[in-house]
Amino acid sequence: MWPFASVPAGAKCRLVETLPENMDFRSDHLTTFECFNEIITLAKKYIYIASFCCNPLSTTRGALIFDKLKEVSEKGIKIIVLLDERGKRNLGELQSHSPDINFITVNIDKKNNVGLLLGCFWVSDDERCYVGNASFTGGSIHTIKTLGVYSDYPPLATDLRRRFDTFKAFNSAKNSWLNLCSAACCLPVSTAYHIKNPIGGVFFTDSPEHLLGYSRDLDTDVVIDKLKSAKTSIDIEHLAIVPTTRVDGNSYYWPDIYNSIIEAAINRGVKIRLLVGNWDKNDVYSMATARSLDALCVQNDLSVKVFTIQNNTKLLIVDDEYVHITSANFDGTHYQNHGFVSFNSIDKQLVSEAKKIFERDWVSSHSKSLKI
């Protein structure tokens, strides 16, 4: 019936936030807890979750979400949680607590063993979905600032479920040739909506390149294209910008996104605001990169601030016309090696709402000048 139904603006997407209780402002949007709770409550057949790690019991709200998942799994709802092979530290405890939930570890890069599953998304019944930067941890649900998108528009949920199928094909318990065969079966139906065919102004982008499949857009290509075509403004709220790729303990320069930001400021006079995180999960290069951008563009309209409370929001807005929400840092290692799905939209309402979030964060008491 989808081809004959009118497509709602923004594909019925709503922004979703987690805000720690010690912040000096509150959100007008659905909370991550409310979003996950609604997905669980409305599920009739299945709930699929992809996350680097799974540690929901670390906070009270995370534990409540996990208990609800356990409850519906006991009633026959199929629950599958994908997590990275290197993020399974709490797996034994969770399996003993909830035997009806199927936990699957994946290794998306058995050949080189450098790629991780970074994707943070939920899909249920091919009807509802969440994608953003909230992993399936108690912190992301309760105590760490995150941003994501919830939609109950079935075509969009179905398209995201295709990504789940692809990641699931890299089950680390399978032999490599089975992984390849399984993944190959996913590729022909890998996506329906992309930058040239958005639905309601919305589409997904993917990483890394070897997992793209048929007609998917590489996240790096879209981000860099948007940065290079920016005319008036670029607003970035990210945990880190790191112009390197790490392989076997060695660092290699990866300036693609970094250079695109500098070129926009110096060559085209684009107004750029960069709000970076500053907590113990940051890469050692992150603050150095922020300072170098500030120094190189001292004669240009580029401003850098540091967010002082744990902030895993990863948001890009270009020319007030395009919004990008992802689970990856602007980091060469993430973009070259790791597996994730990003949300993109040119819908005016969604871009406007995301812009208001950035403006709120930018002027808040938690945002400090880099020079202080």
From Swiss-Prot:
A motif (YPPL) lies at residues 153-156. It is found in: Virion membrane; Host Golgi apparatus, Host trans-Golgi network; Host endoplasmic reticulum membrane. A lipid is attached at residues 185-186 (S-palmitoyl cysteine). It catalyses: a 1,2-diacyl-sn-glycero-3-phosphocholine + H2O = a 1,2-diacyl-sn-glycero-3-phosphate + choline + H(+). GO terms for molecular function: hydrolase activity. InterPro entries: Diverse_PLD-related (IPR050874), PLDc_3 (IPR032803), PLipase_D/transphosphatidylase (IPR001736). It is a lipid-anchor. Residues 307-334 form the PLD phosphodiesterase domain. It comes from the Viruses. Palmitoylated. Attachment of the palmitate moiety is essential for correct intracellular targeting and protein function. Major envelope protein that plays a role in the biogenesis of the viral double membrane and in egress of virus from the host cell. Produces the wrapped form of virus that is required for cell-to-cell spread. Acts as a lipase with broad specificity including phospholipase C, phospholipase A, and triacylglycerol lipase activities. Interacts with protein OPG190. This is Envelope phospholipase OPG057. It comes from Monkeypox virus.
